[in-house]
């Protein structure tokens, strides 16, 4: 990776490696613009879209596969450009697009699993789990070339993953219109699959691969693609993949989470190479922390897994951002992340914003309209919030 010079706040000139690459996969609900209900029309929409848009398990969902980028301005530009194409194309069919963990209006009898052999086999094998998979998530990929490091870092970042989930929380309502009391009901639905949750305690790529082979041998999953751990080495690219997050109505939320995850990966690789012990997350505590993040979002307490205790979400998020300041400054992301984190805490999670929309007129239609509007809005952050890179950077 190329080194480039940067000027820190102290005035000292330092050298920083080119930031690790980032890529995003976003899942989007399709809704009928007349009824605001989920619409199983992805098979009609996808042929109208360019490459990079694909089907998902449910035919009311479309996924985008983003470009590989190195800077946050590039990332945001890619996210918003792909959203604009999807939103504009869907509108020609009378469809709205929603980036959120769940949408509060649907007719269960109208929902359809996508007609591919893989998805139909999943329906046959998992039944209710597949039928109720009316949820959308965001997957964030960060480049790691070494497979062994990828496996080890997946475990080392575990203590901070619940905080990233809380930042993304965008599913307070279930598809029957009920307020679940959670900020991310998607998490509860998702965790029913047999291979979700914390990354397994593997110490090498070979050990991780052996575990996946054993899971396939049990017949519980059919292939490695069904290893749905919260953080996992990606299957087809040299990246580490964060899978815990809800889909996010605001692209800026994804930019924030991606920047924090990239900084976490960098911090833990530095620690691994320096022999710094990893923070050990005991599975029951890790699961409790994920549950609490799904319950509270940014509006209640979160579990601090470093010193196990319940603490206000704002304090946990602020501490994470401050902890990662050296890595964020090295990648020239500090100013952007500090501003986006401040705004996230001031304005609340998407779940809280949806509940505010609901309280205005007690209307779920208003909630869906709010989500459609936020998803389509590509100008929510002033230009100076994502400063232009002064130094060019190589993709690594």
Swiss-Prot record:
Family: Belongs to the glutamate--cysteine ligase type 2 family. YbdK subfamily.
Gene3D superfamilies assigned to the protein according to its UniProt record, in alphabetical order: 3.30.590.20
Keywords: ATP-binding, Ligase, Nucleotide-binding
Its EC number(s): 6.3.2.2
Reaction(s) the record says it catalyses: L-cysteine + L-glutamate + ATP = gamma-L-glutamyl-L-cysteine + ADP + phosphate + H(+)
Pfam name, any one: GCS2
BP-aspect Gene Ontology terms: modified amino acid biosynthetic process
Biological source species: Mycolicibacterium smegmatis (strain ATCC 700084 / mc(2)155)
InterPro entries listed in its UniProt record: GCL_type2/YbdK_subfam, GCS2, Gln_synth/guanido_kin_cat_dom, YbdK
Function noted in UniProt: ATP-dependent carboxylate-amine ligase which exhibits weak glutamate--cysteine ligase activity.
Full protein name: Putative glutamate--cysteine ligase 2-2
GO molecular function: ATP binding; glutamate-cysteine ligase activity
């Amino acid at each position: 990776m190329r080194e480039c010079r940067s000027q820190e706040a102290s005035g000292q000139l330092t050298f920083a490696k080119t930031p690790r690459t980032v890529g995003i996969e976003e899942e989007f609900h399709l809704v009928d613009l007349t009824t605001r209900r989920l619409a199983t029309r992805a098979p009609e929409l996808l042929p109208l879209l360019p490459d990079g848009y694909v089907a998902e398990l449910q035919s009311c969902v479309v996924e985008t596969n983003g470009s590989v980028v190195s800077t946050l301005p590039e990332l945001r530009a890619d996210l918003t450009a792909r959203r604009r194409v999807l939103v504009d194309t869907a509108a020609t069919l009378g469809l709205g697009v929603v980036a959120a963990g769940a949408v509060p209006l649907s007719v269960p009898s109208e929902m359809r699993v996508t007609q591919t052999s893989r998805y139909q086999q999943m329906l046959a094998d998992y039944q209710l789990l597949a039928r109720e998979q009316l949820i959308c998530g965001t997957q964030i990929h960060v480049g790691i070339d070494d497979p062994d490091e990828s496996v080890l870092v997946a475990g080392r970042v575990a203590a901070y993953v619940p905080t990233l989930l809380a930042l993304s929380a965008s599913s307070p309502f279930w598809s029957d219109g009920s307020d679940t009391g959670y900020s991310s009901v998607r998490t509860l639905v998702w965790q029913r699959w047999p291979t979700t949750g914390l990354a397994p305690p593997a110490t090498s790529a070979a050990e991780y691969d052996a575990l996946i082979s054993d899971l396939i041998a049990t017949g519980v999953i059919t292939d490695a693609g069904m290893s749905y751990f919260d953080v996992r080495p990606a299957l087809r690219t040299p990246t580490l993949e964060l899978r815990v997050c809800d889909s996010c109505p605001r692209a800026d939320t994804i930019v924030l989470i991606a920047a924090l995850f990239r900084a976490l990966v960098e911090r833990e690789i530095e620690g691994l190479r320096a022999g710094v012990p990893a923070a050990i997350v005991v599975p029951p505590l890790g699961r409790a922390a994920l549950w609490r993040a799904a319950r509270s979002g940014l509006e209640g307490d979160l579990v601090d897994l470093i010193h196990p205790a319940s603490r206000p979400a704002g304090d946990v998020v602020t501490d994470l951002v401050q902890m990662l300041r050296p890595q964020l400054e090295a990648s020239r992301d500090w100013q952007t992340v500090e501003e986006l984190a401040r705004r996230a805490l001031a304005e609340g999670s998407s779940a809280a914003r949806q509940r505010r929309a609901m309280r205005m007129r007690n209307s779920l239609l208003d909630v869906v309209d709010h989500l459609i509007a936020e998803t389509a809005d590509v100008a929510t952050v002033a230009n100076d919030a994502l400063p232009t890179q002064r130094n060019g950077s190589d993709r690594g």
